[in-house]
């Protein structure tokens, strides 16, 4: 999955799907409000009618909204704006991934990192998004004879309204994606059967990882070396 950042007016952005938030307390996030004005207040009408209440776990897909260039708008419930903290933000991202799984999309643009979340800025919000998306993408298949199809997103783009936040957002995405990949590697090793994931196999994986990154080094000890070091659990 590739991550990127764009700075644009939400109504002017051409994308297969634009993911935006809706609060439970009837107040629309600033970017959603801006988009709603361009779309003839369609989101406000849907919220008023009760088609979406804004609770975390809810979503609603709109297609080809007049005045908006995005092919689809995916409205995501974000709960009460006054209670939005990092934990709830992560829950929103998880539900967003589940909602995206229902549609045949390979590319999305997300405005969720523009939400005001207690005590965290754009870098941390971007990091959490990248980490959660990468880890949600993981599926074990190494020893399965029948490979099941699963949702794969090729590109996730963050939409920002402030150009000065681009650098921090990119940094957050890079960190989050790296953490997510590391978590997936650990999960894969844990899921492999013991006759494959042997100490020798783990040693080879560690050495291979070290060759790919100049900041890492690895040394595999023999049984005799471990014994001399007093590692008596052999």
Language-model segments: residues:
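Short amphipathic alpha-helical segment within the helicase RecA-like ATPase core
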Residues: 1-234
């Amino acid at each position: 999955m590739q991550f990127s950042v764009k700075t644009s007016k939400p109504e002017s952005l051409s994308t297969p799907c634009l993911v935006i938030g809706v609060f439970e307390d009837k107040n629309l996030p600033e970017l959603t409000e801006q988009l709603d004005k361009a779309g003839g207040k369609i989101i406000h009408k849907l919220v008023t009618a009760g088609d979406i209440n804004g609770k975390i776990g809810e979503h609603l897909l709109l297609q080809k909204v007049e005045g908006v260039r995005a092919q689809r708008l995916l409205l995501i419930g974000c709960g009460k704006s006054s209670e939005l903290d990092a934990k709830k933000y992560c829950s929103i991202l998880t539900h967003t991934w589940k909602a995206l799984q229902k549609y045949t999309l390979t590319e999305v643009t997300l405005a969720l990192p523009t939400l005001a979340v207690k005590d965290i800025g754009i870098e941390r919000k971007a990091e959490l998004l990248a980490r959660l998306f990468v880890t949600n993408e993981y599926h074990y298949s190494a020893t399965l004879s029948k490979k099941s199809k699963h949702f794969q997103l090729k590109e996730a783009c963050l939409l920002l309204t402030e150009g000065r936040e681009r650098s921090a957002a990119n940094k957050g995405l890079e960190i989050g994606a790296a953490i997510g990949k590391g978590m997936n590697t650990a999960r894969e090793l844990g899921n492999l059967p013991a006759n494959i994931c042997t100490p020798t196999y783990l040693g080879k994986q560690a050495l291979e990882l070290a060759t790919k990154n100049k900041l890492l080094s690895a040394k595999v000890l023999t049984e005799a070396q471990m014994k001399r070091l007093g590692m008596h659990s052999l």
